[in-house]
Amino acid sequence: MLEKIKQSAEYIASKVEDMPKTAVILGTGLGELVNHIEITETIPYSEIPNFPVSTVEGHSGKLIFGKLGNKRVMAMQGRFHYYEGYNMQLVTFPVRVMKQLGINTLFVSNAAGAMNPTFKVGDLMIITDHINLFPDHPLRGKNYDELGPRFPNMSEPYSKRLIAKAKQIAKDNDIRLVEGVYVGTQGPTFETPAEYRYFYRIGGDAVGMSTVPEVIVARHSGMEVFGMSVVTDLGVEGVVENVSHEEVQKAAAKAQPIMTFIMKELINQFEEM
């Protein structure tokens, strides 16, 4: 595994002149961010040794490098999901490669169904914490000390300073933001009404099929993380909607400009560690 990470990182480094310290995983709701990047390099996943390839509609597969406002960033266009059949090592492989390349801060986004009755479709939720309900764990198996500790501390999975900064940006621009706990499940089925009730009762506010494995590996590697969900459907008791992938994409597209604005401002304003 270490050899594969190094191989991928060396290939990417050979193609990129000025390696950034900040990376963004362009999940649902953030695809438009790429239009704000002054692109200097683009590398398709298919060209990178050992890299998996995304199979999901709406997730194209390439690494993009360039300037977002005043900051150099790496953007991952197209992520890998456990439900696609990848094992956890492959789902999180790009995050390992990011760390090898010197990335210190990771920004992630996703689409989520909300169980919290105060949330509305189109809301943006800052992820303050998560509940991991995936059936496998990205750190299961042999631990390599050079990648991170055997038993990582998860008391602050999402950076409090970045959360505070994002809330300030929203307040200054009169943008409605909610915050809450993201429940990560394997998918690919959307949730049943009973599952929504269960997730809410155990402390979840929104649920989705990504993000948690990447965040675990990023924190294991010592990266600072900020995450945001766009609420694309409701699983509130008595209001469970009939949801489809198309509906999710439609709701995400509507919320995209606001999420893009917040992420762009946040990435430009935060101090790199």
Regions found by a protein language model. Name each.
Residues 236-273:
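His/Asp/Glu-rich mid-to-C-terminal helical/loop segments that flank catalytic regions of hydrolases
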Residues 209-247:
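Zn-dependent metallopeptidase/amidohydrolase metal-coordination segment
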Residues 1-154:
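Metabolite-binding pocket within alpha/beta catalytic cores that recognizes anionic/polar moieties
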Residues 169-205:
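Active-site/ligand-binding-proximal alpha/beta "capping" segment
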